[in-house]
Amino acid sequence: MIKGIDVSSWQGVVDYRKVKASGVDFVIIRAGFGRETSQKDNCFEQNYKNAKAAGLDVGAYWYSYADSAEDAVREAKACMEVIKGKKFEYPIYFDLEEQSQFAKGKAFCDSVIKAFCGELEKNGYLAGLYCSTYYLNNFVSNNVAGKYPLWVAQYNYRCTYTADKYGIWQYSDEGRVNGISGNVDMNYGYTDYPTIIKNGGYNGYKKPVTAEKKTVTQLAKEVVEGKWSNGDERRQKLTAAGYNYSAVQKKVNELCEKMKIDKIAHEVIQGKWGNGEERQQKLTNAGYDYDKVQARVNKLMKEQ
């Protein structure tokens, strides 16, 4: 669990270095509201710039007044225009809390959520939903709420929303944090959104290029060639690179056994181990598997 806040122009000028020093890890910033880019939050740019400079992870939210799914799409486009060119480590949230929207019922609320979030998703954003527990329970279908990262508001000592897993809980609107004059909304975060977003290539981030994984056989050959060190160092290197050490070492042992058998088989062909029962006895006494060696000898002889 990590600590976060959400801010808008209502908080005025924020000293994010003091906010960061107080133990806050992330901030969700209001980007704007409504269907026009002219409705951008007056403090959005300075909040974004200063929060980033202080080393905070940042998300954004867009307050909705949408009265139709089409209107929600317009809001999404306005939101994307405002936030374009920026990187966010937390989702871009659709803020659903207008009474006029809830008055239109669950089907309506579902439609505007899907319209807004769907438009953002089409354009490479991880879109989420902000809503209170009461309205989530009564005006949003579980299958819709479950599709998006949830930011749940409930000012209580615990969050009672249980229909779906939520990533953030807004637990108070009367918090006090160094660097902010007056009250501020307080949040607990439960999901590692920065990793999800960066690895997924969302919210302005490019998806990292992952090196092609080598097969166990390829790795085993490299181990035999001495490219992965020995003992614990080998185990550590293979594990750190994301490989299964036990599987690789098993294949190494198989390859070494095969190489050993090949060497002995060539010596047998050269007459160094005698013939018939004498050969069998010598190989067995030396600790070799006579049947495996002889099978390899037979195969090599056929190939000549």
Q: Across the structure, where does each feature detected by a protein language model lie?
A:
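Disulfide-bonded cysteine-rich modules in secreted/extracellular proteins
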Residues: P208-W228, E257-W273, K299-Q304
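Stable alpha-helical elements in mature extracytoplasmic
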Residues: D15, K40-N47, A72-E75, C79, ...
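Extracytoplasmic Gram-positive cell-surface binding/anchoring modules and repeats
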Residues: E222-R235, I269-Q280, Y288-Y290
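Substrate-binding cleft of extracellular glycoside hydrolase catalytic domains
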Residues: M1-C117, E121-G124
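Aromatic-lined carbohydrate-recognition surfaces of secreted/lumenal glycan-active proteins
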Residues: G124-N138
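Hydrophobic anchor at the start of a short beta-strand
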Residues: V58, L126-G128, L150, Y290
